[in-house]
Amino acid sequence: MAQDCITIKGTRGGLLILLDASRDFNEIKANLAAKFAAARGFFRGAAFALVPTSPLNSQETAELEAICREHGLVPGNNITLPSRRRPGGNQAAHPDPVALTSTGLPTLLDEGNLRNGQEINYPGHVMWLGDVHQGATIRAGGNILIMGTLKGNAHAGSQGDRSAAIVAYRMEPEQLGIAGIIARSPEQKTRHPYPEIARLVGTRIVIDPYLSPKSSRN
């Protein structure tokens, strides 16, 4: 499968949208629009800057900026890529948060595959672009959005927020937690070929298809 031509990175100032300008421009546009559509408004309100691997002409830049604006992003200034490291130990490094105006908490945006023994702890929302493998854990004070497969552990609302939710493209977790309520995956896991959302209903964690931001709580 061809490598993604778009990479989105979070910084203190906003989102850096890294573009592989060697790819077909129509492919770049389609990939960018697909990423925003899949995020379902998660980026809305964030500042952005385009970072192509080689210069774009003014028409190409305008078309890509238009796609970003259509999904609620706003052009930003002085957005720079933070220095990053991912140590071999258990704690995975993360960049500075992206503040989204549509939420009361900052958002951590990062990408990659979280491996067995690695753990992300963050007081705000976490958006992970990649898979979370068995034995890996994400803990967030707010919501967790995994744009990949969740096979490890995800704990949202870690400071007691009962309205927090966990969304994954493929929901196959070892363990889910929301506001201290824990649910463990059954031995016979049912795999569904669509995104799902886990929320707290009473004292139970309920998983529904993620059809829209207003998908049923029942």
Swiss-Prot record:
Matching InterPro entries, A to Z?
A: CAP/MinC_C, MinC, MinC_C_sf, MinC_N, Septum_form_inhib_MinC_C
The record's listing under Gene3D superfamilies reads:
2.160.20.70, 3.30.160.540
- Note whether Cell division occurs among the keywords: yes
What are its GO biological-process terms? Answer: cell morphogenesis; division septum assembly; regulation of cell division; regulation of cell septum assembly
Instruction: Read off the Pfam families from this record.
Output: MinC_C (PF03775), MinC_N (PF05209)
Q: Which residues form the signal peptide?
A: none
The superkingdom of the source organism is Bacteria
Listed A to Z, the keywords are: Cell cycle, Cell division, Septation
This protein's assembly is summarised as: Interacts with MinD and FtsZ.
HAMAP family assigned to the protein according to its UniProt record, in alphabetical order: MinC
NCBIfam families documented for this protein:
minC
The record's comment on protein family reads: Belongs to the MinC family.
Outline what the protein does.
Answer: Cell division inhibitor that blocks the formation of polar Z ring septums. Rapidly oscillates between the poles of the cell to destabilize FtsZ filaments that have formed before they mature into polar Z rings. Prevents FtsZ polymerization.
Specify the protein name: Probable septum site-determining protein MinC
